[in-house]
Amino acid sequence: MAKQGDLKTQPRSEVQLELLRLDVGSAVALVGHPIHVMMVHFPVAFVIATLGVDIFFWWSGDAFWVRVGLWSAGMAFWSGVAASVVGTGELLLVRGIRLLEASWSHAVAAMTLVAIGGANWGLRLVDTAAILPHGLALSALASVMVGFAGWHGGKLVFDHGVGILISPKD
């Protein structure tokens, strides 16, 4: 049996202290795994792929890359919308997450990324001739925003322990 002052029973880091103080567990989870964390990889991958596709189109001029870019940008946008819906659910349902400033920074960066992704996909739907330079610029901007959103999302997990535990409400 552990004593009151035993190191094994006492939190040893700021993250552990914050986990005890705030409820920052996941409220939107599947078999104990936060759904938002499982979903965010897809829009990130599609945003980066769209930038690569645009660079290939710029380099080769092959119309094949126009169609691939349309699909990639569309998947980036729609998978981003899906991840955003789940992330917004976490933000609204878990008080401890709402209280963290980093949560709001991540949310704003992610919403900006989804808006840029939507503009990028919409541009490709309407005017394929505008891919160079506007689509390429939007793809580059979206890739930069992936970095900002990912940085703030990582801070939530590694600095604040968000999503590490299931919410006690479950």
Predicted regions and their residues:
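Polytopic transmembrane helical bundles with strong interfacial aromatic enrichment
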Residues: 2-60, 67-170
